């Protein structure tokens, strides 16, 4: 049997996964989609829009925006929700990737860029230099472009907890010295579901990263995101929002998890738009400076808007 059709523990389709009306949307103009896809492929790049099968990619492409995925297309983690390739040896670092991303940004005429990456636990700096080199290349062409980063947790490589925290902090320091306009790291889900959803990451490692970012660079806003529909309860979502505020996280995104394929963790529930509206009100009352909450919201959606 082909590996692409091999059954997994998630190979059943639950009735709850039939898309409700509020999650159905047009994909956008075919010509606009093709134009953006050709530009990305022509520069031998990856975008999280395509790799993650984002439901907003038609809208974002139509607006001439994209979130660039750095470090190749293979991740060293194996999160149960993510469409990005995993479970294979990571790719060799492409020394020309930063220049190609910068060229694409220039060709697209972007004013606000989001850079994210696969996890690169195989590298000594866990991929930090991939971010900083790409940021430098973009600014060399246009120093006025604003750049947001959406990063892995930069955790690992050291067995001792204290040394692991120190290593994470050193990697983060190197990234923040490049002065992104926003530092984004997603918790993805509530604490109870972390091991099921985010294999290789933990709730507290992520919170420690966000806390350190605020301490090291208080002028750079921090941001995090949650996917709903994985089996969490509303009380747990509120607790997670409170935990994010406890480390002074200033921006938050809340969106519906959509299953990329039968090989991924199933949708447990489709949250109603009113639920997202109510959670947005809670988040605002908790003191978040920016809240994006809706079924189709993703961490980079309308990222450049105040």
Swiss-Prot record:
GO terms, molecular function: 4 iron, 4 sulfur cluster binding; lipoate synthase activity; metal ion binding
Span of domain Radical SAM core: 61-289
Residues the record lists as binding [4Fe-4S] cluster 2: 75, 79, 82
Protein residues bound to [4Fe-4S] cluster 1: 49, 54, 60, 300
Cofactors demanded by this protein: [4Fe-4S] cluster
PROSITE patterns: RADICAL_SAM (PS51918)
EC class name: transferase
Keyword list, A-Z: 4Fe-4S, Cytoplasm, Iron, Iron-sulfur, Metal-binding, S-adenosyl-L-methionine, Transferase
Gene3D superfamilies membership: Aldolase class I
Catalytic activity: [[Fe-S] cluster scaffold protein carrying a second [4Fe-4S](2+) cluster] + N(6)-octanoyl-L-lysyl-[protein] + 2 oxidized [2Fe-2S]-[ferredoxin] + 2 S-adenosyl-L-methionine + 4 H(+) = [[Fe-S] cluster scaffold protein] + N(6)-[(R)-dihydrolipoyl]-L-lysyl-[protein] + 4 Fe(3+) + 2 hydrogen sulfide + 2 5'-deoxyadenosine + 2 L-methionine + 2 reduced [2Fe-2S]-[ferredoxin]
Compartment(s): Cytoplasm
GO terms for cellular component: cytoplasm
Cofactor: how and how many bound: Binds 2 [4Fe-4S] clusters per subunit. One cluster is coordinated with 3 cysteines and an exchangeable S-adenosyl-L-methionine.
Pathways per UniProt: Protein modification; protein lipoylation via endogenous pathway; protein N(6)-(lipoyl)lysine from octanoyl-[acyl-carrier-protein]: step 2/2
EC number: 2.8.1.8
One Pfam assignment: Radical_SAM
CDD domains, A to Z: Radical_SAM
Entries under HAMAP family matching the protein: Lipoyl_synth (MF_00206)
PANTHER family the record matches: LIPOYL SYNTHASE, LIPOYL SYNTHASE, MITOCHONDRIAL
Family: Belongs to the radical SAM superfamily. Lipoyl synthase family.
Protein name per the record: Lipoyl synthase 2
Name of the gene this protein is made from: lipA2
